[in-house]
Design a protein with these regions (language model features):
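Short glycine-/aliphatic-rich beta-strand segments at the starts of folded cytosolic domains
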Residues: 1-11, 44-46
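Weak global preference for isoleucine
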Residues: 6, 16, 62, 68-70
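A structural detector for beta-sheet-dominated domains
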Residues: 8-10, 35, 49-51, 71-73
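Short amphipathic alpha-helix segments
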Residues: 10-31, 59
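Acidic, low-complexity, intrinsically disordered interaction modules
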Residues: 24-57
Length: 73
């Protein structure tokens, strides 16, 4: 299942590379693709290849742990 998300990096201490690495290692996302960067808003559009819907719950946990804002597209 592919899910696009927009991640706001304003309030996070991690870089987009660190976020992608965490998603792929800690949370079993097979493939994280950075589709676009919106410089004005400091946001990234990511395409996540998730194994199943349960990963969406884990995504919420990671977002909470990293203290980032995420929007589903």
């Amino acid at each position: 299942m592919k899910q696009q998300v927009i991640v706001s990096m304003d309030d996070t201490a991690c870089t987009i590379q660190e976020l992608v690495q965490e998603l792929e290692t800690d949370f079993d996302v097979q493939d994280v693709e950075v589709l676009e960067y919106y410089e004005k808003d400091n946001q990234y559009r990511l395409l996540l290849n998730l194994e199943d819907d349960a990963n969406l719950d884990r995504l919420q946990d990671i977002v909470h742990d990293l203290d980032i804002d995420i929007e589903y597209v």
